[in-house]
Every structure is written in structure tokens, then in C-alpha cells.
Amino acid sequence: MTEDCLNGRRTAFDDPYKPGRNALSGIQQVIEAQSPPDLVILLLGTNDFQSVHQHKPWHSTMGISALVHAIRTAPIEPGMPTPPILVIAPPQLDNPRGPIGPKFAGGDTAARGLARAIRQISEDAGCLFFDSNTIITSSKHDGVHLDADQHHALGVALAPVVADLMADRDGG
């Protein structure tokens, strides 16, 4: 398992203040470096709704669609399998507040319908989908991030999903 989180990462958009936050710009190299991955899990979209962007769910899902395409067309060695992709809708922003509040001002309104839009783009692209909103909420402290208990609950919920995917992939 390889984890590749980066604070502030967007699906396919640049951060005007912090370079290197565009997931699309490096995803193919990550796939190639980790080839062949058994599964790719994408949990992105929250940062697409920072106040520097005027995005709606459609924009974020176009970023996810571009990531899926990039993963499937990564320059891996001939004969290596293309991994299945599990797309996870992030929890809905909930009244961003505290020091991070201005950074996400209006994001909770702009992101309404994101999970539904991600579900649709995932189905259209033949990706697996999981809605984290069925298990967790955004942080009680800032309305944006996940608190430790949400991380744990999401991990517990995803463990059997991933185990089943790996068993199916391995023919078991």
C-alpha cells in the first residue's frame, strides 16, 4: 500500500499560493512508480471548493474524470494491468470556520451535490464508488477536514470494501 496525501491537493486545479497541489500534474508518474498497483483510491474534491476557485460540482467531477483518464493511460510497462479505481466522495463541507474558514468561504454552498455528481461520473467511467457521507461528516472543529474518529470510521468502513475488491481481483 502506498499513500500519497498532500494537504490542499485539488483534482486538476492549481493553487495560486502553493505550487504542486494539482493532482493531475503528477498522477501518471505515481502510477508508473508504483506499477502495477492493485487498486487506486481517489478521495479528492474538497479543496476544489476553496474560495480562490469559483467551482461547482461539475468542475470537480471533470477533474476526477481527467484523473481517471490519466491513471488508465499512464505509461506503465507493456502487459501490466490497469488498476481498478475506487472513487470516494469526500464528506460535505459544513460551515467552514476557525482559521481555515475564510479559505473555504462559500465552499459548503458551492459543493452541494458533489457526492451525487461524483457518483455519476464514477459510474460513467466504470469506476467503483463509495460515498463517505454515509459514514462520516466533516470535522466538528473546522467543518472541512476529518477528525481522528472520522478517519477511523472511514477506514473501518472501507476495509471490507477493499478486501472484497482484492479478493475479486485475485480470483478469490
Where are these regions (language model features)?
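A short beta-strand-loop structural module common to alpha/beta enzyme folds
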Residues: 1-13
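Alpha-helical cap/lid subdomain in secreted, periplasmic
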Residues: 20-172
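Structural motif
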Residues: 11-22
